[in-house]
Amino acid sequence: MIDASHRTFMARAIQLSLENVRSGRGGPFGCVIAREGSVIAESVNQVTATNDPTAHAEVLAIREACQKLGCFELRDCYLYTSCEPCPMCLGAIYWARLKKVYFGSLASDAAKAGFDDSAIYAEIAQPHAQREIPMIQIMRDEALVAFQEWEAQPGKIPY
């Protein structure tokens, strides 16, 4: 059974998504990040409002939560999003190490509304050079120097 507080935070994420659509400012996505029963951050999709293809509700809420908490890990936080996260947001969620994610609609629901991520998942499975946007590896040896120096750096902050 889902706790009432989870429903409250999810209802807010859904409300944010509706407000965003009704205002004409962006897509139907809202997100809330909570910790210990309190909202830490909330956001809506701002892709078209900011001309930033990475301005998804989840990414923006993660950025805000990290700034407010002064850390880059959100291990004790919950994320509530009006829709199942896209591949980019899923990556951000894992990098932020959130405790748990609650989502409303499915990726298939988003696809029906024109937000179809299936092509991205298919692209990830392709070899680099065969992707729609070909990815060509060059200068690996030179690029590895930064990793070698990182590994040798005392006092680094791993993440």
Each model region followed by its residue ranges:
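Zinc-dependent deaminase
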Residues: 1-22, 85, 92-159
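A short, polar/acidic, helix/strand-boundary loop motif
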Residues: 3, 47-48
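Short, basic and Ser/Thr-rich N-terminal targeting/leader segments
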Residues: 25-29, 73
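Short beta-strand scaffold segments in enzyme catalytic cores
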Residues: 28-37
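Residues that line or immediately flank small-molecule/substrate-binding pockets and catalytic motifs
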Residues: 47, 81, 105
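Helix-adjacent hinge/juxtasegments
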Residues: 54-55, 59-96
